[in-house]
Amino acid sequence: MCIRDSPYAPWLEDNEKPYYTDKPDWDAFGAMLLVAACRTYEEPVPSTVEKDWIFGEHPLIARLASDEERVWSLLRGATWWLPLADAFFFQAPLPTDDQTMIATLGGLRKELEKLNQLAWQADEDTILGWADTEGYPVDGTLGPDGQYSKADIPEHTQYDTQSLAKFAFSMFWRAMRFAEEQQVPILLDY
């Protein structure tokens, strides 16, 4: 274990700092974790995931979440990432007295870089674009009159795993970059 000689510099928290508010939903977040688990253990990635699936019950996600040699804050329940370059995480109380796992941006960056290396080897421009080009299927059509319609569009009960994973990954990458540039924490809000 490495002990720092000096404390970390505080970051500024006020209502004047810019903020970033985009986030994936649980289906997309779970798809990203599933791709991470499948690629880590060299297993095939399922082509689809069910709508509202309970991703924590998937055997490969559960295996990676408990793997003592491969520790990812994303799989250990982190909900806060502090703007620190070192990679570590810990459990601590929030101001609400709820306990949460708190990690660092340095650790999140390493995890996201590892996932990209395992799954896609995409450059940053491609990654940033996935939030706009990947994700959920269209839930409606734009008619000739310019009106949006859901007529004749079946409800989706399955989603493309890779597309959802890329969508979530892009949002996490964007949040991480923003947090690094602005020196602000990332907080998952659910």
Residue ranges and their predicted role:
Residues 4-182, 190:
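Acidic (Asp/Glu-rich) sequence patches and key acidic residues
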